């Protein structure tokens, strides 16, 4: 510090110019200047509110072992909501990595297409799609309507046929469930959705219709992801022994999906919480639990240091 000040007095060159020549930022120089002559104060022993107690580490590890295949972020918010332990996703990640319990995660592919405007409120966009379901070698058809904002399944049916009339029936029943909704209907270019009868039906219901471009996940990927989730976590897990058995099992899974399953795209809340406007309450409760846990750890660390 003294040399720099002396050099400035001798040459008249501004300190910032000298610091630039030395490759040193002014903020770092003045930080050193404020500390000049003071003893070093290491912060390694200062209490951290993310230091976990042994029981918290054990709770995270035990919970992860009971939920194999579940990502660390999902585990974090599930543990928080169920009052198992209150930690951040980063803390859960560190604990699981230390114990060799992290699941491998594949990064999603990128698409060059952009421009689809996402909904800002419930019932602004309804996505509709048809997916094939095999029941003992025979195909039936899952027709589902999904709210694009909340990811809530507005209505679904497992039907024997997939005609335009079947699509109309499913959409009509979805509208009966939410009679005040006037969403924009988003679909692919399947024959049912481009037919004249379907256009007349939408005009009668006073609904706008948007057909998506192929390979464009921003527009209709939400309901395609729903179909994949149902097949992966329900249909391929439990065999379906008939149409009624399939309707019962798929219906039970969709109820779980809407009311109990945390969704990564909506702040790890359930679709129903977002649809019904309860998201703020749940997020505030999580913040309260995390702050209480941090305060308790700080107090425990302070007692240990005495």
What are these regions (language model features)?
Residues 1-13, 57-66:
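Short, amphipathic alpha-helical "recognition" segments used to contact nucleic acids or chromatin
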Residues 41, 151-156, 210-212, 236-237:
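Short small-residue beta-strand/loop micro-motif enriched in glycine and branched aliphatics
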Residues 203-205, 228-306:
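C-terminal domain-tail junction helix/linker
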Residues 184-189, 203-222, 238-243:
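RNase H-like polynucleotidyl transferase catalytic core
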Residues 30-125, 217, 272-280, 284:
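Basic, flexible linker segments flanking DNA-binding modules
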Residues 58, 66, 85-86, 90-146, ...:
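Mobile-element integrase/transposase regions
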